[in-house]
Amino acid sequence: MKKRYLAMLPFLAAALLAPISQAQAPVFQITPVQSTVKFSVKASVAIEGNFEKWDATLTFTSPDVTTGVLDIKIQAASVNTGSGMKDDKLRSKDFFDAANDPLITFKSTKIVQTGPNTFDVPGTFTIRGVSKPETLTLVVSGVGTGSGTIKGTMAFDRKDYGMNSGIPFIKIADRVEVTVNLTGKRISGPPLVVKK
């Protein structure tokens, strides 16, 4: 009997410590109505737009901001440039191929603080089923308070992801710029801690 209790001690300790560890991690909630995911491409006729359907989560394992993981999932078919013709072309197999690969995703692999409120966030970017490493550059406000904003920018070469076609009568560049504006609030746990 005594041996059985001793054998159970590690499992009991893990069960007791797990809630304490989780309670020490801040929990954030992104507010979609106050957030946007936009893109732009230089062209003979300006191409810029946003995605109307997407989801973003920001999770932490401790109050240290560099332990965070940013996970963004975008529904490619929700693209909106204000032009039905452009939207249909971008949804097609020449660009997003939304019918076969409905999600555009970015998931961070680490967060590196580069200044008092700036961060480089390398991660895996996937579009059209092609995944490559890309980096979001973030400017964050409200760190350490109950709410804040994140402005992230990233640029990628569309041809790296198999988007080699053009749009009829429009000359477009290869470089695509993405801007992510996220507003969120801390719903539980301690404030985030950053280096000054």
Regions found by a protein language model. Give the residues of each.
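Positively charged n-region of N-terminal signal peptides that target proteins for export
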Residues: 1-4
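Bacterial N-terminal signal peptides
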Residues: 8-18
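Low-complexity, acidic/polar, glycine-enriched regions of mature
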Residues: 22-196
